[in-house]
């Protein structure tokens, strides 16, 4: 839900302004006067971080500024720096020319150094001023074979956390959190029941990191503060990690992302299925559908394409919820096998519409009326 509103803002900001985007990969990076670069070690770390920012960090390659252990651990994943997909929602060559980095502090923390950097834009006007700064990143520098390299915050922050393994899930949480064994067991039962109902392959073990808020979760993703990367939950299947900002051992929506078979499916179907079976934003599928139905009732011009392109309803999780309603309708029509066919929808808007129409036996020009009819069935009288 939150991610959709940020996406809308990003498109508006980068594509709707008259500012010309520079494509240079050399950025104006300020070192705050609090940082004493006369100290050789501090200067080396500052230069390391500056070099990394100028190395097109959003491009996946063997970046020499990052530690080898994490590069090897995540070599088959999409990125090794956990901040990448949230910080660079537009290419670094664009983003870093708007939100210019200022290194705020480089402080010794045990054997590592914590590096904090604010990404702030000059000269923003109107509504865009409310979205400044973009974020404050905090990650670490560690010694590796006599050289300083960058490292994610997650293993450093969580190294002294408690860990409880139940079934295939290892729950990791700070000592201040009171572990709820009943909810943990409920999580195992949920994962097993979904896998059985939809005949998914056996699910792999994963680590479930429990925090109390989106801000605390953000720290595990290298953010002291974030706008573009703010979230209260994330399932990272390739990494075997689930992150929660709800302070609970039970997070069915995110479990779904770790249970679904690997496939580059359309996000409306992936998020729709997760919302249908696991709710979203702390609301059940039924509650989300009722909210969307009320908004549909107030607007008789909204189309399927408006929601698909996130032009309408992002503040009501319309993209997620409409996907869930489609999943429910497909299930009513053809059961589990039809839902599994829907889950094989490729990541293409045209293929999405084609597959929905084929499974539900409707014509392409009927999809708007179909969606309106199905959504309004959830309206409270």
Model-flagged regions — what are they?
Residues 128-161:
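Short beta-strand edge/turn micro-motifs at domain boundaries
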Residues 1-26:
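Bacterial Sec-dependent N-terminal signal peptides
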Residues 80-128, 241-244, 252-255:
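Surface-exposed, charged secondary-structure patches
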């Amino acid at each position: 839900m939150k991610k959709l509103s940020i996406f809308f803002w990003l498109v508006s900001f980068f594509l709707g302004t008259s500012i010309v985007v520079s494509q240079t990969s050399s950025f104006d990076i300020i070192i705050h006067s609090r940082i004493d670069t006369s100290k050789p070690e501090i200067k080396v770390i500052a230069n390391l971080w500056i070099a990394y920012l100028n190395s097109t960090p959003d491009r996946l390659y063997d970046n020499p500024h990052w530690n080898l252990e994490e590069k090897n651990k995540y070599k088959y994943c999409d990125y090794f720096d956990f901040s990448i997909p949230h910080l660079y929602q537009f290419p670094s060559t664009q983003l870093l020319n708007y939100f210019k980095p200022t290194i705020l502090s480089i402080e010794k923390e045990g054997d590592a150094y914590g590096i904090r950097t604010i990404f702030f834009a000059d000269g923003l006007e109107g509504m865009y001023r409310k979205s400044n700064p973009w974020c404050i990143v905090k990650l670490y520098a560690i010694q590796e074979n006599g050289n300083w390299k960058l490292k994610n915050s997650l293993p450093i922050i969580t190294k002294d956390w408690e860990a409880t393994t139940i079934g295939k899930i290892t729950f990791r949480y700070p000592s201040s959190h009171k572990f709820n064994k009943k909810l943990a067991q409920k999580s195992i039962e949920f994962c097993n029941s979904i896998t059985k109902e939809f005949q998914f392959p056996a699910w792999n073990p994963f680590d479930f990191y429990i925090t109390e808020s989106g801000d605390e979760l953000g720290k595990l993703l290298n953010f002291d503060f974030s706008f573009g990367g703010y979230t209260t939950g994330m399932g990272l299947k390739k990494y075997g990690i689930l992150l929660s900002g709800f302070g609970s051992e039970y997070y069915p929506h995110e479990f779904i992302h770790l249970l679904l078979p690997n496939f580059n499916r359309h996000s409306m179907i992936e998020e729709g299925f997760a919302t249908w079976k696991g709710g979203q934003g702390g609301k059940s599928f039924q509650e989300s559908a009722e909210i969307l139905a009320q908004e549909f009732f107030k607007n008789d011009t909204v189309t399927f394409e408006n929601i698909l392109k996130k032009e309408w309803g992002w503040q009501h999780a319309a993209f997620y919820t409409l996907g869930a309603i489609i999943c429910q309708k497909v299930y009513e029509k053809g059961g589990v096998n039809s839902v599994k066919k829907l889950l094989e929808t490729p990541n293409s808007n045209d293929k999405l519409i084609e597959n929905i129409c084929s499974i539900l036996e409707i014509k392409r020009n009927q999809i708007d009326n179909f969606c309106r009819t199905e959504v309004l069935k959830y309206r409270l009288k």
